Amino acid sequence: MSLSNKTVKELRQLLKERYTVEDELTESIALSSMRFKPSQEPEFHALSQSSLLKTKLKQQSSTDIPSYTHVLISKLSCEKITHYAVRGGNIEIMGILMGFTLKDNIVVMDCFNLPVVGTETRVNAQLESYEYMVQYIDEMYNHNDGGDGRDYKGAKLNVVGWFHSHPGYDCWLSNIDIQTQDLNQRFQDPYVAIVVDPLKSLEDKILRMGAFRTIESKSDDNSATSYYELETIIFDSELNRALFETKLNLHCVIEDDESEQISLNRLIDSMKQYSYLMDSKNVRTRIKLATTSERVSNENKKNIDYQNRSTRSQFCLNTQRGDSTETSSFGSMFSGDNTSDVDMEDRNLTQFDSTDTSLCINGEPSIHVNRVERSSRSTDNFHNSKKRMNSNQEKCHDEGNDMLQRNVLETDYARAKNRILASKIKQYERLRFYKDTFTL
């Protein structure tokens, strides 16, 4: 497949049709194309970072406790929170919100994540997390001498809340979240809790985020803590707005060398496993052929032995029949003549005499031998047929397992190969786009 003659549009169509990747390669695209829903109220249309900072500096201190109804969050903070949550995947993440208050609004200017222990449904901040938070704030936000601290035009940033993720189960506060938020509101108010759902945000390409505060509701003698949602407004800097209006409508995908290397390792592992599967199958086939030939040889020996025994028994039977015939004829010589001087009626039988013929006496052992041989042969035939049946069942079972493993390995190989090809074609498509755009 030659790519040198294809245009950028054809390359993108090729990627869309043949190399559609459904995993981590599309996360950066979805994150960059995610839409932030703006507020529809006219009073918030002209919001900007500089106007909020100027209003903060002009604000007079008040002793009245405000009732917070809005959360103003910068686009930078939204992108950071979304990036942390998407990187966490199905595991919950947690972080701290930095900002200030403005009348009945909580303004979030920046944020940072915490090293926490998270699961799919819970996140716990240990002692090391709080130590990291104190050191980070002291290093990044508490420099007033023009050092490495972040400059927000004289406005001092404080901790105004925390954020965490709910992967796949929407934005709300659980019982543990309510207890944590209520404890923080009691000791370091103003404090707000922001919850983000990264999976639904990637699926819908709209930021799923909610801001919440707790309130103590009293009914009769029982007091219970509930929460309410604050309206969230996203603002941006004037510099970012100007850059957004003049930039090219192109989503630059950040290359992840580790994912490409992982796909290459998976491709190599699939090839090794497939080769091992074929070698083991050949070994089993050779062993079965050797076993089958040995069994056939043993059966041939048994057949030859049976034929020899049958021949010997038939020979003995014929011999015995000949002897009995001679004995009968010899007796008739004496009993058939009436002129014999021997009186047959007066003759007394001795203990050695017998009224039975030798044919009946000698015939019984040969019949018994034939019956035993027939029974032995039928038993051997039954065992041989049973062995052949078991062998056929084992053969079908082994063939089914081999086919299943082969299909799985072929699928893994094709998936890893498509990922690598998609990554390379994406790189070539961007280079081709830059060449066509900036070449005179």
UniProtKB/Swiss-Prot annotation:
One GO process term, biological-process aspect: proteolysis
UniProt keyword annotations, A-Z: Cytoplasm, Hydrolase, Metal-binding, Metalloprotease, Nucleus, Protease, Signalosome, Zinc
Enzyme class: hydrolase
Keyword set includes Nucleus: yes
Disordered as annotated region, ranges: 319-343, 376-400
Classification via CDD domains: MPN_RPN11_CSN5 (cd08069)
Motif (JAMM motif) on chain: 164-177
GO cellular component: COP9 signalosome; cytoplasm
Binding positions for Zn(2+) per the UniProt entry: 164, 166, 177
Cofactor(s) listed: a divalent metal cation
S-S bridge residues: none
Biased composition (Polar residues): 319-341
Family to which this protein belongs: Belongs to the peptidase M67A family. CSN5 subfamily.
Function: Catalytic component of the COP9 signalosome (CSN) complex that acts as an regulator of the ubiquitin (Ubl) conjugation pathway by mediating the deneddylation of the cullin subunit of SCF-type E3 ubiquitin-protein ligase complexes. The CSN complex is involved in the regulation of the mating pheromone response.
PANTHER family linked to this entry: EUKARYOTIC TRANSLATION INITIATION FACTOR 3 -RELATED
Protein name as annotated: COP9 signalosome complex subunit 5
Native source species: Saccharomyces cerevisiae (strain RM11-1a)
